[in-house]
């Protein structure tokens, strides 16, 4: 089953992404596969500008920023034991995981 598995992690909190990536790397290394990463991908920032008042004062505005953080992990020489270990792994609820085989 020796194939490459690519895992993308995405979250609005960088600490959750880093802890999840660390957990995955530790689990995969314990299962005996090779790991490349976690590789930090560019942070995507969305900025929203809104008026402070509902009706007047166009010059008075407020900006909000929403940042999403991403990490990439590549797993090489994976076995059935590695896949089982990844399936049993519990990650925090604020992390989106995308897996490509």
Curated annotation (Swiss-Prot):
The keyword Ribonucleoprotein applies. Keywords: Ribonucleoprotein, Ribosomal protein. GO terms for biological process: translation. PROSITE patterns: RIBOSOMAL_S10 (PS00361). GO terms for cellular component: ribonucleoprotein complex; ribosome. One of its GO terms (molecular function) is structural constituent of ribosome. Transmembrane segments: none annotated. Pfam families: Ribosomal_S10. Belongs to the universal ribosomal protein uS10 family. HAMAP family: Ribosomal_uS10. Part of the 30S ribosomal subunit. Involved in the binding of tRNA to the ribosomes. NCBIfam families: PRK00596.1 (NF001861), rpsJ_bact (TIGR01049). This is Small ribosomal subunit protein uS10.
